[in-house]
A protein has these predicted regions:
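Conserved catalytic motifs of ABC-family nucleotide-binding domains
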Residues: 155
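ABC ATPase NBD coupling module
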Residues: 70-87
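Conserved ABC ATPase signature
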Residues: 134-144
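Conserved ABC transporter NBD signature motif
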Residues: 61-69
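Helix-to-loop junction immediately C-terminal to a conserved catalytic motif
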Residues: 53
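Short coil-to-helix segment of the ABC ATPase nucleotide-binding domain corresponding to the Q-loop/switch region
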Residues: 99-106
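Catalytic Walker B motif of ABC-type/P-loop ATPase nucleotide-binding domains
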Residues: 159-162
Length: 163
């Protein structure tokens, strides 16, 4: 199994304000499969993606890539895991305002041993003619496509998309 999510539990708050957000989540995903998380606002979708991506930690349970638990990885190995295997499209795309669109996409390539061609990605996403513009010169949809380009340029094994 390429990605294993096992018994993931996460809560926020304590005492009377304690809220169980994730309660024993399991999933097994092979390379090339598509898995979609559906649920209402506040149901823990973003939290689970953040745990898979190593941005947050679970209260219990584990994430494994090719059988290796991410919790057992030292910081160097976890960074390598993120660089090699993960692309992440955040709900808020957080483009760097003083870099043009091409430079914003190319940032993702620095984290890869085998990046895709920047110009080809920009053409595919309909952004090539905007490559020298700054993020604030684009529409919200164009900015989101720039964030998608940044996530896919490193040709990740796992692409986590948060809305």
């Amino acid at each position: 199994m390429f990605l294993t999510v096992k018994e993931i539990r996460k809560h926020f708050g304590e005492g009377d304000s304690r809220v169980e957000v994730l309660n024993g989540i399991d999933a097994e995903i092979e390379k090339g499969e598509i898995c979609v998380l559906l649920g209402p606002s506040g149901s823990g979708k973003s939290t689970l993606l953040n745990i898979i991506g190593g941005i947050d930690s679970a209260d219990s349970g584990y994430i494994a890539i090719n059988g290796e638990k991410t919790a057992d990885m030292n910081e160097k190995r976890l960074t390598l895991y993120r660089r090699k295997h993960l692309g992440y499209i955040f709900q808020q795309y957080n483009l760097i305002p003083n870099l043009n669109i091409k430079e914003n996409v190319e940032i993702g390539a620095y984290l890869s041993d085998n990046p895709l061609d920047t110009d080809e990605i920009l053409k595919t996403l309909g952004l090539y003619e905007h490559r020298h513009k700054l993020p604030n010169q684009l529409s919200g949809g164009q900015q989101q496509r720039t964030a998608i380009g940044r996530a896919i340029i490193k040709n990740p094994d796992i692409l986590l998309c948060d809305e």
